[in-house]
Amino acid sequence: MDIQVKNGSALNVSEQVFGREYNEALVHQAVVAYLAGGRAGTKRQLSRAEVSGGNTKPWRQKGTGRARAGTSRGPIWRTGGVTFAARPRDFSQKMNRKAYRAAMRSIFSELLRQDRLVVVESLTVEAPKTKQVIKALNDLGVEKGKRLIVTEAMDEALLLGSRNVIELGYRTAGTLDPVSLVEADKVVITQGALKMVEEWLS
């Protein structure tokens, strides 16, 4: 199948990668797995075995008029430990490589169907200036909404020039993730990056 490039030429790509049916369930699984993998999961509380103090009986068993107590570490005490103390946990979800790649193929196919994939021969700016990046995108007709630039290799000028623009992301073909692709209204990708993606997902 052929994809139109902004310079007017056509780029031949694999229909096995860019002509798939949209599998919403699989894409959802990939997005959830990616977001879950980014969770820190560092919450931790002290149990009654870990709080300080409480080594001795606070007062004698009988004769004080107060309720009997053996330790001040118990959960009903103000400085006591937590009953079921939280522990750091791993939120990451396992997703098979085959399923993940199928989800990415599904996303790229849907981007192409919805005319949200803009293929350019190359995308460079002379200096790391926000103005130049915005002008380059405007020249391509990508002016509004959430935009994502994808190149085959890291371009320092593009990176520095784009990071101050609201709703504009920048990735290389090797660092693409399902969330940034799904969220983008327009994905501007270079021919070289598209070929790298095709090779990866073939």
Predicted regions and their residues:
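Glycine/serine-rich anion-binding loops at beta->alpha junctions
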Residues: 48-84
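A short, flexible low-complexity segment enriched in Lys/Arg and Gly/Pro that occurs
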Residues: 26-62
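Extended polybasic, low-complexity segments that bind anionic RNA or targeting/receptor surfaces
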Residues: 1-40, 85-202
